[in-house]
Curated annotation (Swiss-Prot):
Pfam family, one: WD40
Recorded GO CC terms: dynein axonemal particle
BP GO annotations: apoptotic process; axonemal dynein complex assembly
Purpose of the protein: Key assembly factor specifically required for the stability of axonemal dynein heavy chains in cytoplasm.
Primary localization class, coarse: other
Protein name: Dynein axonemal assembly factor 10
Superkingdom: Eukaryota
Localization: Dynein axonemal particle
């Protein structure tokens, strides 16, 4: 067999045009359904649930809301309830029962401006401790919410007095390997990456990567921090080895410039934490594998342990659209099944083959 065929292939299985701008698509856990979130041209928000049936997409339900919906997560819900938490253009955090979506089961005015990003942990059997939701907004704040607590966040991470407010573009939970430890990573428009330790209520680490940070994700939320990928505006992404933190040098990292345009998102494969996909502004997807170095840490000149970065290998890439792919989500249940949505107002179901051989 030729080498090209032995590599994973990214196959566009189903494509569907939509009559609205779609910002996020998420698989509904334990199902062949996914939900798309966005806004109609008339300025209202929309959630559509699609089901894959006989190789086609069937619209199961369409829900219209007063405000455009920017982002969503199932990360803080149980597998039984499967409630969707969303952030909208008005700064509202809502949690919906998609079976009865008329009014939210939890609602709070979370931010003064648009909620750009949302993540959840402690639900779906992923991560120990209480289910929590984190939101990041244009108002410069990052807040952690517990849906059992009305109106006020559990944690509010905001700039100190006199510090300029930066637009927060992306948030992610990690390090939730027991019921005390938990971290939030946030990325900002000026290139800042900040790692907040929720156990000690402190800023554990910060770094500037010089370009706006579009997406951050830990390779797993529910383990002792292992790796973090951050993507940016100029087509560059960084992989940080989070196992060893040097007091002054921080975490070791490797960077790669793959796309010629903004990398909108990164998503790790749920079944293999060393494989991840990046989604680009020119409508392309790149599939990567991280290779660990022979030794992940070494003693520096000051006799203090420091991390050693590995390398990244490009497994496959494909161009699906002329417009940015703004959202990407792997199926947690079926390896290689993936949904992505683009600013060409369409949603695509992809199949990535041979992932068990990489």
């Amino acid at each position: 067999m030729s080498a090209a065929l032995e590599k994973p292939q990214i196959i566009a299985h189903i494509q569907k045009s939509l009559n609205y701008t779609v910002f996020e698509s998420k698989w509904i856990p334990c199902s062949a359904k996914f939900v798309c979130m966005g806004n109609f041209a008339r300025g209202t928000g929309v959630m559509q649930i699609y089901e894959i049936q006989h190789g086609e997409l069937q619209l199961v339900r369409e829900i219209e809301k007063s405000k455009p919906i920017k982002c969503g997560t199932f990360g803080a819900t149980s597998l039984q309830q499967r409630h969707l938490a969303t952030g909208d253009f008005d700064g509202n955090l809502n949690v919906w029962n998609l079976e009865v979506p008329d009014s939210p089961v939890y609602s709070v005015k979370a931010h003064k401006e648009i909620i750009n990003a949302i993540d959840g942990v402690g639900g779906l059997g992923i991560g120990d401790g209480a289910p929590e939701i984190v939101t990041g907004s244009r108002d410069g704040t990052v807040k952690v919410w517990d849906s059992r607590q009305k109106d006020t966040p559990v944690v509010n991470m905001e700039p100190t007095e006199g510090e300029t407010k930066r637009d927060c573009w992306t948030v992610a939970f990690g390090h939730a390997f027991n019921d005390q430890d938990r971290c939030v990573c946030a990325g900002y428009d000026n290139g800042d990456i900040k790692l907040f330790d929720l156990r000690n209520m402190s800023l554990r680490w910060e770094k500037n990567i010089r370009n706006g940070v579009c997406s951050v994700e830990f390779d797993r939320k529910d383990i002792n921090m292992n790796k973090l990928v951050a993507t940016s505006l100029e087509g560059k992404f960084h992989v940080f080895d989070m196992r060893t933190q040097h007091p002054s040098k921080g975490f070791a990292s490797v960077s790669e410039k793959a796309h010629k345009s903004t990398i909108w998102q990164v998503r790790h494969l749920p079944q293999n934490r060393d494989v991840f996909m990046t989604a680009g502004g020119a409508g392309n997807l790149h599939l990567w594998k991280y290779e660990y170095p022979a030794q992940r840490s070494k003693k520096g000149a000051d006799d203090v342990e420091m991390g050693v970065a590995g390398s990244v290998n490009l497994l496959q890439n494909v161009t699906l659209s002329t417009q940015p792919i703004s959202s990407l989500d792997w199926s947690p249940d079926k390896q290689g099944l993936c949904v992505c949505s683009s600013f060409d107002q369409s949603v695509r179901v992809l199949i990535v083959t041979k992932l068990n051989t990489v």
